[in-house]
């Protein structure tokens, strides 16, 4: 797995470096124009095909583990399903997990696509500035925004996990573990902090300049950030404790060992 990730990172780093060196504005389409000028337009098609294969591999990996992961979350009480569905969790195929994940993804995609395409006001998008394409430009920039915030949240988790390991391990097996670990924590913390502070600064500048579109865009951006932080870091233990107390009270109300009150 580590070897595969390393190869993918190397390939995408080479693509990003090529785009930066061959185009004045850093746009991927500019690389295609440069290759056409050099009579290498076919290579741009091959490059797009390889990117599509990489995306298909990511989707395939996601589909392979999402069902089992969802079912493990259901078993631990992190996700809710009807009691009858819990009887099917131990079957070889994770059907319950796939259905649950599919419903969540469809609802989330519809909600976020509607919000991004109808309400988000991005900067000028040269690729979608024609009549009828404004919603698509808004949706693409909003999708990029969601991907950015999700990546920030993932890096925050990685930094917290690494910080927890540094605090828990008293005598590491390798002498360089603490140095490299603290360096990684500092770099992750500073970079993600800059990304999270930027929209607040942009909102202040937009308010000062009385730019309505930028005020709306940055407000939505900050709202999405707050929602993601709440979803990822909100403690679920108080909710579990409250549900458990209600369950105990229901069992006491109908008598001990009451099968009708026992939930799977």
UniProtKB/Swiss-Prot annotation:
Which InterPro entries does this one have?
A: AA/rel_permease1
Keyword DNA repair part of the UniProt annotation: no
Concerning its family, UniProt says:
To M.pneumoniae MPN_308 C-terminal region.
Q: What is this protein called?
A: Uncharacterized protein MPN_096
- Name one molecular function that GO assigns to this entry: transmembrane transporter activity
Indicate how the chain sits in the lipid bilayer: Multi-pass membrane protein
Can you name a GO cellular component term?
Answer: plasma membrane
Pfam families from the UniProt entry: AA_permease_2
Q: Where in the cell is it found?
A: Cell membrane
Q: TM spans, by residue?
A: 1-21, 43-63, 95-115, 146-166, 181-201, 215-235
**At the top level of its lineage, which domain of life is listed?**
Bacteria
Q: Which UniProt keywords apply?
A: Cell membrane, Membrane, Transmembrane, Transmembrane helix
Predominant place of localization: membrane
Q: What is the lineage of its organism?
A: Bacteria, Bacillati, Mycoplasmatota, Mycoplasmoidales, Mycoplasmoidaceae
């Amino acid at each position: 797995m580590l070897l595969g990730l390393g190869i993918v990172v190397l390939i995408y780093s080479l693509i990003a470096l090529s785009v930066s060196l061959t185009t004045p504005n850093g746009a991927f389409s500019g690389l295609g124009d440069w290759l056409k000028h050099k009579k290498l337009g076919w290579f741009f098609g091959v490059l797009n095909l390889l990117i599509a294969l990489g995306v298909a591999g990511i989707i395939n990996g996601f589909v392979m583990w999402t069902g089992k992961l969802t079912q493990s979350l259901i078993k631990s009480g992190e996700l809710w399903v009807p009691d009858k569905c819990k009887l099917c969790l131990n079957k070889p195929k994770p059907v319950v997990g796939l259905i649950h994940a599919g419903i969540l993804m469809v609802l989330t995609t519809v909600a976020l696509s509607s919000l991004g395409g109808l309400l988000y006001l991005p900067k000028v998008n040269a690729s979608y500035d024609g009549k009828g394409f404004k919603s698509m430009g808004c949706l693409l920039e909003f999708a990029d925004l969601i991907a950015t915030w999700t990546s920030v949240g993932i890096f925050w988790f990685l930094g917290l996990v690494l910080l927890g390991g540094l605090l828990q391990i008293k005598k590491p097996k390798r002498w360089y573990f603490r140095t490299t670990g603290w360096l990684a924590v500092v770099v992750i913390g500073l970079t993600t902090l800059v990304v999270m502070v930027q929209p607040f600064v942009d909102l202040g500048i937009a308010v000062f300049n009385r730019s309505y579109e930028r005020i709306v865009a940055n407000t939505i951006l900050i709202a999405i950030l707050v929602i993601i932080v709440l979803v990822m870091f909100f403690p679920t233990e108080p909710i579990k404790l409250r549900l458990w107390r209600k369950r105990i009270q229901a069992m006491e109300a109908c008598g001990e060992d009451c099968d009708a009150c026992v939930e799977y």
